[in-house]
Structure formats: structure tokens, C-alpha cells
Amino acid sequence: MSAAWAQMSPVGTWRSMDEKENTPKAQVKITEAGGVVTGKVEALLRKGADPNALCTECKDELKDKPVVGMTLISGVKKVEGKEVWEGGRILDPENGKTYTVRLTPVDAGQKLEVRGSIGPFWRTQTWIRVQ
């Protein structure tokens, strides 16, 4: 993988940010295998966060599983001809809900716009590249 492609790709290590406090919430590692992008929580960064926190709001097999190591992003693929990845899902472990997701690298790949939506409602977070 070329350095330029790596920078304009969601693949890498990212810090998700608390939108209200502008402080890091979690570190997420995004990988790609067979054209499909997946993101897992590596660490919880919020001040006072329990590193052994469980996803108490999650449903099904994720209920009460550790948040660290959990897959948040799944099934995402690159849109042909665009620097956009979509078609997958993102989990919010704080409320246990899953959303459709679109990932768009911006600022020369140093930031990642993570847009989650349910129907006509959406929210965009900006994550910061760590690596």
C-alpha cells in the first residue's frame, strides 16, 4: 500500500472525540481485508473511563461484552472512484444502537469524518489520525 493511499484511506489508528468537550473518547484501529473495512476499539481514553467497561446497552451477542476489543465498524467498502467508504454499520456502545456509516478521510487523511445515520437522521463525528 502506498503512503499516499494509506493517508487518504480510513485504514489506521484513530481517536474518536467527544463532541461537547472536544476530548478523546476512544482509540479505534481500522483495518482492511479483502476490500472490507473493520474498526475495533483499542482503548478507552475518556478521563476516568473504566478500561474493563462492558457494553451494557448492546443487544444480542454483544450484551455485557468488553468494549475494548469490540468491533464498532463492519462491512464498509470503498465507493468506486471516490475517497469515501460506506455500506457498513457502526455501533455506538454508549446506547447499543447500530447505524449505517460513511467514512471520509479529510485534511490530507489526518482526520476522518465518520457519519452515522438511521433513516433521514444523521450525525457526523471527526476522528483524529494517531497512526
How would you describe each model-predicted region?
Residues 33, 106-108:
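Structural motif
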Residues 40, 113-115:
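Beta-strand residues in well-ordered beta-sheet regions across diverse protein folds
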Residues 2-6:
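Sec/Tat signal peptide C-region and signal peptidase I cleavage site
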Residues 102-104, 111:
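C-terminal terminal-subdomain/extension
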Residues 10-11, 16-101, 128:
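Central antiparallel beta-sheet cores of small beta-barrel/beta-sandwich binding domains
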Residues 109, 117-131:
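Edge beta-strand at a domain terminus
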